[in-house]
Amino acid sequence: MKVKELMDTRVMSVSPDTTYEDVARLLYTHQVSGAPVLDEKERVVGFVSEKDIVRILYPWYKSFYESPESYTDMEARESKAGDIRNTKVEVFMKRNIITVTPEDPIMKAGALMLAHDVSRLPVVENGKVVGIVSRDSIYKAVLKKNFGL
């Protein structure tokens, strides 16, 4: 099965100068886990996900896991979330983006998602995003084909 058979062609994207607040609202409202970041020529320059949205709220999360007892006032830290609302996506987006083509096998897309710990991949053809393929759509297609679910 090819990526083109599963990809969603209704691609919601953002630009590098989209604000944190706007991208968070967009992902939440449309109930998607991420979106490609496109430049003015509609080329993929990054990807922003729910994980990136949460991670910027907790820039200290790695040190927290090393020494959780040193973080006593979590509410005060969370109250500073408003300070980042105008931060541009280009500051916290992922830059080294893995993409697939419409002709790639879905098993390749699935393997790339697992290897890179992502749940969605932009589908690119001739340098332009033509769709998004999700781990969920691959999972469902494989179960349906192999187990009749």
Regions found by a protein language model. Name each.
Residues 5, 52, 137:
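Ca2+-coordinating acidic residues in Ca2+-binding motifs
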Residues 1-32, 37-40, 44-45, 68-112, ...:
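Bateman/CBS regulatory modules and CBS-like beta-alpha motifs in cytosolic regions of diverse proteins
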Residues 114-115, 121, 138:
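Extended hydrophobic
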Residues 46-49, 132-138:
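Short hydrophobic beta-strand motif reused across regulatory alpha/beta modules
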Residues 54-69, 138-149:
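A short, polar/charged loop-to-alpha-helix boundary motif
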